[in-house]
Each structure stands twice: as structure tokens, then as C-alpha cells.
């Protein structure tokens, strides 16, 4: 696995200085711009394009808290596993997922905009709490628990997307 933190010369940490990240991204992209390689041979152009792709992938990873966390876990455990394929062992959270999906379905059927707004706020609050817990687990090097929080965040991200879709459908009416 390519270390996205190393590409931008940043410390491996959950909290990333986004302004510094953007600044370094612009510098790297400027240095790798195709115009700089017009007179270069095909191999040099291909290498520059590959590096540019690596920079873009690293940026995507560092901007997304789930991907960033998974990168930290992989770098520290040496396991480049597909964390998305792990199923959560937290039965209480599995039950909560079912309840949330049912609640969202009921809100959509009843077309209750106030209930949807309240539900969205609760999901946002839960997401913030899990992000905080994830950061703590990463700081304590509890990689397995951190991976479980990544799974929870992935679900909450999908749920937030579904809430947005329901919101769009309600406002179309």
C-alpha cells in the first residue's frame, strides 16, 4: 500500500491539516502537470501520469475520515485488508441499523418533513460521536476496534445519503 501521508509529507494521524494538505496537493499537481512533460519521452510522461494518479488517490484518502482511518490501520498493522468486507460483530449496532432503516422508511411513507429533519440531526450526532470514538481508538492503537468504528461510519454515511434522497423526494411533491 502506498502511504498517502508520505506522499504529502504529513504525519500519520487522524487529524490532518486540510489547508496544508491542499497547499501540498497544488504544489504536487503543478509539478506533475502534463505541460511540464511535453518534451519528455513516453516513459517519463507515463511515470508523471502515474504519480499524478497516486497524488489524487492519496488526496481522496486523506480527505475522507473512513479511508484515512483505514490507511492508518493498514500502515500500522501491515494488513492491506479490505475493511469494507468485514462484518461488524456489534449486535446492538446491527439492531440499531434495522431500526434506523425502518424509521426512515416510515418517515418517507408518512411524508413527515419535521420527522425527517429530526432523524437527520440524530444521525449526524451519532456520526460525530463515532468519529470521536474512532479517533480515540486510533490514538490508543486499538486497530480492531477502530476498524469496527470504520464499519459503523460507512453505514452512517450510506444512511445519510439515503436521508438526502428521501429529502429530495419529499420536496419534489
Would you name each region that the model predicts?
Residues 1-173:
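C-terminal accessory/regulatory regions appended to core domains
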Amino acid at each position: 500500500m502506498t502511504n498517502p501521508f508520505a506522499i504529502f509529507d504529513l504525519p500519520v494521524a487522524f487529524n490532518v491539516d486540510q489547508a496544508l494538505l491542499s497547499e501540498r496537493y497544488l504544489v504536487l499537481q503543478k509539478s506533475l502537470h502534463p505541460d511540464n512533460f511535453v518534451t519528455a519521452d513516453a516513459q517519463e510522461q507515463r511515470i508523471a501520469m502515474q504519480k499524478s494518479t497516486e497524488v489524487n488517490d492519496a488526496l481522496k484518502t486523506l480527505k475522507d475520515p473512513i479511508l484515512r482511518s483505514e490507511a492508518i490501520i493498514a500502515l500500522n498493522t501491515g494488513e492491506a485488508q479490505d475493511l469494507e468486507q468485514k462484518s461488524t460483530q456489534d449486535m446492538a449496532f446491527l439492531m440499531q441499523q434495522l431500526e434506523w432503516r425502518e424509521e426512515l422508511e416510515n418517515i418517507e411513507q408518512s411524508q413527515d418533513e419535521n420527522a425527517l429533519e429530526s432523524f437527520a440531526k440524530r444521525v449526524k450526532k451519532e456520526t460525530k460521536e463515532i468519529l470521536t470514538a474512532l479517533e480515540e481508538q486510533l490514538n490508543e492503537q486499538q486497530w480492531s476496534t477502530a476498524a469496527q468504528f470504520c464499519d459503523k461510519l460507512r453505514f452512517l454515511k450510506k444512511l445519510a445519503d439515503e436521508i438526502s434522497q428521501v429529502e429530495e423526494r419529499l420536496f419534489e411533491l
